[in-house]
UniProtKB/Swiss-Prot annotation:
The keyword Disulfide bond does not apply. Residues 968-980 have a biased composition (Basic and acidic residues). It is a single-pass type I membrane protein. The active site is at D815 (proton acceptor). Residues 16-618 are extracellular. Residues 676-962 form the Protein kinase domain. Its main location: membrane. This is Receptor-like protein kinase HSL1. PANTHER family: LRR RECEPTOR-LIKE SERINE/THREONINE-PROTEIN KINASE-RELATED, RECEPTOR-LIKE PROTEIN KINASE HSL1. SMART domains: S_TKc (SM00220). LRR repeats lie at residues 59-83, 84-107, 109-131, 133-154, 155-178, 179-203, 205-228, 229-252, 253-276, 278-299, 300-323, 325-347, 348-371, 373-395, 396-419, 421-443, 444-467, 468-491, 493-515, 516-539, 541-562, 563-586. It catalyses: L-seryl-[protein] + ATP = O-phospho-L-seryl-[protein] + ADP + H(+); L-threonyl-[protein] + ATP = O-phospho-L-threonyl-[protein] + ADP + H(+). It comes from the Eukaryota. The gene is HSL1.
Length: 996
């Protein structure tokens, strides 16, 4: 009866053999939206011709099933283990979900199991070790968690074990050292609990590849690893390893690549590494290594040498120039001295050379580009001298040239100006002379031309106007002369034009209206004449304008009022007429000095119409005041003597304040100090208390009083404790000075800093709509439409992207949250408190909650719990939380979410209920598609693994494409399955290496 039932139920599959019947069950258990399994026809006699299926030679039984990248979804099809001769199974890059069942052990003949890049969760099944024939096990890129099962130490034939990119959080177990057959061990990018490298791994004498990247390893590298004589690739990067590099690693006679970067290794590089004749790639960057670079190491035929950001001394051994295939040297950020080997580049296809931030001297080697492959020449902050070798003028492969802060002199070779692939040419702070060659017109890819503080002469060539990609032209502090070429006005991509401190003359023409992307214009201290063109007001993104120290005449264009300028300086010209009304404010009093013909209601300028009348009454007023003074003199005398002591103390107190200003100020530190009243407090957080201060000139500023030891305890600033600047104060001032130089429309302007030893005040521009967090979670939050919220997200992203990628030096915010995103009167967003956490910590008096934790509850990236390190990826995670907060209008940590934080709640609710239950119900449903895309960006930013989070520059691009309707970028998924990364994996590392 049972057979009859099967016959009636599946009449068409009786033609199939048993293996075909099993595969039909597999097909039914999986979701196949792309119909990848359409060739699996139940009418066939055998499945051996089906896509992804291979059979033994007699076509009687299935031995291999490969369904890689088939877009299949569903739980693991356990029924497939009924294929008695199945030796190879690959479901790589699908959406296989749920847990991997214990009955996987039923696949008794399995030799290869590849389930990488899926959505599997839960613990690793201990029964995997019960498959006696298993040779290759790849579970990379899933969401497995918990410990590695103890049974894994009992594999009998396993050669490959890859568990990369999971969520395993136990310790790395010593019993893996029992798998004597193992050739490849890859555990990289898992949040393991801090643990040491088990010395037992030295027993894996057949091991060829050991990748333990970013596994939270601590302690020293065990000497036993030197026993792995067959090892080809060793990667221990991105951990917390300490101690010396063991000389025993000289026993790795077959090793080709060693990656030790980003640890805390100390001591000298062992000369025993010179025994590694097969070594081609060595990266021990970002450690604390000392001593010299061993000559023995440089005699090995290396291809890539990365030792940057250590404390190495001495010279770069000349023997490095003999390596026949050397293509990369990155040794910046050390204390290396002497000259570069004179034959460097002569014998090898050198492509990337970065020796910045050392103490090198002498001439540049003439043969750096002898093989015609040099792309990056980065040597900033050294003491190189002499001239640029003529040979480099023929190096057409160059893309980035940074020779700044050296002692070069002489003319720049003619061909050097016109190299066709160069996008960055930086010659700052040298003694170069001569003119810019007309050949610069051939530099069609040039984006950044930075020539400041040299001795260049002549005029800018007309050919410079053909550089359509030019974004920055900085040539201040030279001896350029003549008029600006007309062609310069056609540079539509120009964002910064800084020509101050030269001898330029002529007029500024109306052609400047083409500079639609210009953010900074500095033509100060030249000899320009004529009127300031009205068209300057059409430069909508201009926020820095300095035309001081010229001979401009005529009226100030009324159109200037339409600009949102952070910096304006028109002083010391020949301007006349009335100030435009919105500029006639005391805060601009220093912006117009030295213009005798200029009139306005600012002290120092010629008077207004009523001023003459006012003078007529001066004599009468003086008489009245003198009489009143005589009447009150007796009473005032008593008060004078009574408070004389108080006034002296007050004067002493004020004298101890140090003011560091970053803009033209219309107020003094005394006015700020007198307004620090508890009635003016508008907020308080982990880094300090914020006051709203209305100034006498009518302007409003926000004053943040940073928490320090005494302030936190007493609640008051006490400057009478004897202020003596020290290292911590200098570090604080240096940090704040960096913050004060920031100029961006989406970053809150820092007016100035007032400080004593025990009190630090930061004065910011005031944002009338308060913080995003307060606005979003107040009664007004539900009235924020989607377009306003999207604008806030994009504005904040652009501000944070500027800090990460365009600020010099780059700045990590450390505490991105909705309360640190402020909203202006037009509901534009501005990032605030950037770097404040670091600045407070530099005082050495941060409260415990501040010094221990960088960030705010609910916004902190998960890896911080076990690394206690903050980088740009931490900011990106926090920004992703802000996106989710804006979309859902729920706080990151809320009793409504139960034991979950916002990220986990969004993920689980999306899976269980759908997006309708995630989005704020106050939002218009017509924006659902766009909101969904933004939500995906937020989830991408909050990826548990930092490596999977996009850079902020990429986030901005995705947001812009969503706003423009382009969704292609949202579906691009990185498919790396090997887990192997270098320090240069990010898409936005144009300034990787040295950044100045």
């Amino acid at each position: 009866m049972y057979l009859l039932f099967l016959f009636l139920l599946f009449p068409t599959v009786f033609s199939l053999n048993q293996d075909g019947f099993i595969l039909q069950q597999v097909k039914l258990s999986l979701d196949d939206p792309d119909s990848y399994l359409s060739s699996w026809n139940s009418n066939d006699a055998s499945p051996c011709r089906w896509s992804g299926v291979s059979c033994a030679g007699d076509f009687s039984s299935v031995t291999s099933v490969d369904l890689s990248s088939a877009n299949l979804a569903g739980p693991f099809p356990s029924v497939i283990c009924r294929l008695s001769n199945l030796a190879h199974l690959s479901l790589y890059n699908n959406s296989i979900n749920s847990t991997l069942p214990l009955n996987i052990a039923a696949c008794k003949s399995l030799q290869t199991l590849d389930l990488s890049q899926n959505l599997l969760t839960g613990e690793l099944p201990q029964t995997l070790a019960d498959i006696p024939t298993l040779v290759h096990l790849d579970l990379t890129g899933n969401n497995f968690s918990g410990d590695i099962p103890a049974s894994f130490g009992k594999f009998e034939n396993l050669e490959v074990l890859s568990l990369v990119y999971n969520l395993l959080d136990g310790t790395i177990p010593p019993f893996l050292g029992n798998i004597s057959t193992l050739k490849m061990l890859n555990l990289s990018y898992n949040p393991f609990s801090p643990s040491r490298i088990p010395p037992e791994f030295g027993n894996l004498t057949n091991l060829e590849v050991m990748w333990l990247t970013e596994c939270h390893l601590v302690g020293q590298i065990p000497d036993s690893l030197g026993q792995l004589s067959k090892l080809v690739d060793l990667d221990l990067a991105l951990n917390d390893l300490v101690g010396h590099i063991p000389p025993s690693l000289g026993g790795l006679t077959n090793v080709v690549q060693i990656e030790l970067y980003n640890n805390s290794l100390t001591g000298e590089i062992p000369p025993e590494l010179g025994n590694l004749k097969s070594l081609r790639l060595l990266d021990a960057s970002m450690n604390q290594l000392t001593g010299k670079i061993p000559d023995e190491l440089c005699r090995v035929p290396l291809e890539s040498l990365n030792l940057y950001e250590n404390n190495l001394e001495g010279e770069l051994p000349a023997s490095i120039a003999l390596s026949p295939n050397l293509y990369e040297i990155r040794i910046f950020g050390n204390r290396l001295t002497g000259g570069l080997p004179k034959d460097l580049g002569l014998n090898s296809p050198l492509r990337w050379l970065d020796v910045s931030e050392n103490e090198f001297s002498g001439d540049l080697p003439a043969d750096l580009c002898a093989k015609g492959e040099l792309e990056e020449l980065l040597i900033i902050h050294n003491s190189f001298s002499g001239v640029i070798p003529e040979s480099l003028a023929d190096c057409r492969s160059l893309t980035r040239i940074r020779l700044a802060y050296n002692r070069f002199s002489g003319s720049v070779p003619t061909g050097f100006w016109g190299l066709p692939h160069v996008n960055l040419l930086e010659l700052v702070n040298n003694s170069f002379s001569g003119e810019i060659s007309k050949s610069i017109g051939g530099a069609s890819n040039l984006s950044l031309l930075i020539l400041s503080n040299n001795e260049f002469t002549g005029s800018l060539p007309e050919e410079i106007g053909s550089l359509d990609n030019l974004n920055q032209l900085s040539a201040s502090g030279n001896k350029f002369s003549g008029s600006l070429p007309d062609s310069l006005m056609s540079l539509g991509e120009l964002g910064t034009l800084d020509l101050h401190g030269n001898q330029f003359s002529g007029e500024l023409t109306s052609g400047i209206k083409s500079w639609k992307k210009l953010n900074e214009l500095n033509l100060a201290d030249n000899e320009f004449t004529g009127k300031i063109p009205d068209e300057i007001g059409s430069l909508s993104v201009l926020n820095y304008l300095d035309l001081s120290g010229n001979m401009f005449s005529g009226k100030i264009p009324v159109s200037l009022q339409s600009l949102k300028l952070n910096q304006l300086n028109l002083s010391y010209n020949r301007l006349s007429g009335d100030l435009p009304p919105s500029l006639a404010k005391d805060m601009y009093k220093n912006s117009f000095i030295g213009n005798p013909g200029l009139c306005g209601d600012i002290k120092g300028l010629c008077g207004s119409e009523n001023e003459a009348k006012k003078r007529g009454y001066v004599w009468l007023l003086r008489s009245i005041f003198v009489l009143a003074a005589m009447v009150l003199l007796a009473g005032v005398a008593w008060f004078y003597f009574k408070y004389r002591t108080f006034k002296k103390a007050r004067a002493m107190e004020r004298s101890k304040w140090t003011l560091m200003s970053f803009h033209k100020l219309g107020f003094s530190e005394h006015e700020i100090l007198e307004s620090l009243d508890e009635d003016n407090v508008i907020g308080a957080g982990a880094s300090g208390k914020v006051y709203k201060v209305v100034l006498t000139n009518g302007e409003t500023v926000a004053v943040k009083r940073l928490w320090t030891g005494s302030v936190k305890e007493t609640g008051d600033c006490d400057p009478e404790k004897g202020y003596k600047p020290g290292v911590q104060d200098e570090a604080f001032e240096a940090e704040v000075e960096t913050l004060g130089k920031i100029r961006h429309k989406n970053i809150v302007k820092l007016w100035c800093c007032c400080s004593t030893r025990d009190c630090k005040l930061l004065v910011y521009e005031y944002m009338p709509n308060g913080s995003l967090g307060d606005l979003l979670h107040s009664s007004k939050g539900g009235m924020l439409g989607w377009q306003t919220r999207f604008k806030i997200i994009l504005d904040a992203a652009e501000g944070l992207s500027y800090l990460h990628h365009d600020s010099v030096p780059p700045i990590v915010h450390r505490d991105i949250k909705s309360n640190n995103i402020l909203i202006d009167g037009d509901y534009g967003a501005r990032v605030a408190d950037f770097g404040v956490a670091k600045a407070v910590d530099l005082t050495g008096k941060a409260p415990k909650s501040m010094s221990v934790i960088a960030g705010s509850c609910g916004y902190i990236a998960p890896e911080y719990a076990y690394t206690l390190r903050v980088n740009e990826k931490s900011d990106i995670y926090s920004f992703g939380v802000v996106i989710l907060e804006i979309v859902t209008r729920k706080r990151p940590v809320d009793p409504e979410l139960g034991e979950k934080d916002l990220v986990k709640w969004v993920c689980s609710t999306l899976d269980q209920k759908g997006i309708e239950h995630v989005i704020d119900p106050k939002l218009d449903s017509c924006f659902k598609e766009e909101i969904s895309k933004i939500l995906n960006v937020g989830l991408l930013c909050t990826s548990p693994l930092p490596i999977n989070r996009p850079s902020m520059r990429r986030v901005v691009k995705m947001l812009q494409e969503i706003g423009g309707g382009d969704e292609d970028s949202l579906h691009k998924i990185r498919d790396d399955k090997d887990g192997k990364l270098t320090p240069y994996y990010n898409e936005d590392t144009s300034d990787q290496g040295s950044i100045a």
